[in-house]
Amino acid sequence: MKKIFDEVRSLDKRAIEEFHLTEDILMENASLGLKNYITKKFKKNSSILIVCGSGNNGADGISLARLLQNKFKVSLYILNEPKTEIGKLQLKRAKSINVNFVNQIFQADVVVDCLFGTGLNKELDQDSVSLINSLNNLNSFKIACDIPSGLNSLGQITQTAFKADITITMGALKTTLLTDIAKDFVGKIKVANLGLPEDIFQIETNKYLLQKSDLKLPLRDIQNSHKGTFGHVNIVSGEKIGASIIASQASFAFGAGLVTIVSQNEKNIPCHIMQSKSVSENCTAIALGMGLGEIESLKLEEILQLNIPKVLDADIFYNPLIVKYLDENVVLTPHPKEFISLLKLTNIANISIEELQENRFLYVEKFCKIYPKVTLLLKGANVIISKNDKIYVNIFGSSKLSKGGSGDVLSGLIVSLLAQGYTSLEAAINASLAHTIAAKKYKNNNYSMSPQDIIQGIKIL
């Protein structure tokens, strides 16, 4: 896991005050981070266009031009003259070694965006909007310095934003880069070292970025076992049996020893999945909500009252009964529209999808502060998983998963791990990672993946 911070100004300040680095040293290391990436990735004498604003982000770019001089064909475009003293000093240094300044942008091999940093707190003027749009239209490899210009400190876009192939962010990961809105603009994310070891520069935080290496598969280490050793999943089916079948197959593929669909009507289901009209006596985890539709309230409450680990999904988030059971150790897996309903039922907020998507971290934190026992998994382009005051972000999701049934696979994976003894937080994190990594490895085109393809991918992780 990697630490994530809402802001890093305090980290920069601490580096200066406690570890005696200077603003100049921090900036030199920021520029070195950019320079090292460019030097490693691109051939000598490639054309590099560095586009700078008037603040410290622009000063980073001017410093970068100096470091790349004579190794690449460097051109420096300055939208506005530097306002800061360090920016003016960097400009003087660049001029002293005859860095090439240009008055127009052009098609270069590489474009580096150094216009605006994380301090952007106002609407862009028309010149800036036009420039960013023109940069986006260039067929160049695009690098954002620290943050794509146009993203504000909350990861929101008011007019336009630079669309990077990679963002090289300075010192530490920032929440602003990990919003759903930002995902189409940041590209890959790489952290540049600012002159101190990571564990010294960074402090404690409550937010973490999940890595592929964090995935812990339910591998079977014991040989003296039987099917009951690995848990018995019960998936409660409502009107739409398809969702329950998908979830049951995912559970079985992810290690559950037994899987039963609980339904009042006999259904035609896969032969390795069992059926029952009531929850099994030896059930070790329940999934409820997928394809639920209308179900008798007494029957629903009877299931919710069972002291068994649960995954709650889909239709359940529109039922007021759920509020009574949010003090229990359950996993909730809403998509944004369902989470809005849940926020309304709990009197936390009455907001639109747009408001939620612009402030996903905020509303997740609000919800989990009031319901600290719950593990919440908010679906999205970047999945947010939270329990109590801790937040974990999974950025491995892709548009391949934007298909009906993908969420049912996820619920099946989570309940499978719960049945096998994982804690609610462990189950949510590992199932989410498995779900997104399996989808990422899907080799065919990105519009054709089905739930069965995800399940097949799970089997070969």
Residue ranges and their predicted role:
Residues 1-71, 75, 166, 177-309, ...:
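Small-residue (G/A/S/T)-rich helix-start motifs and N-terminal tracts that mark the onset
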Residues 35-114, 123-145:
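Nucleotide and nucleotide-moiety/phosphate-recognizing core
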Residues 80, 103-105, 171, 193-195, ...:
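Residues at the C-termini of beta-strands that transition into short coil/loop
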Residues 126-142, 296-314:
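A short, gly/pro- and small-residue-rich
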Residues 94-100, 125, 148-153, 214-219, ...:
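Short gly/ser/thr-rich secondary-structure transition/capping motifs
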Residues 93-97, 119-124, 289-293, 310-311, ...:
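Short, flexible loop segments at the rims of nucleotide/cofactor-binding pockets, characterized by
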Residues 109-110, 115-205:
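Internal gly/pro-rich beta-alpha loop/helix module
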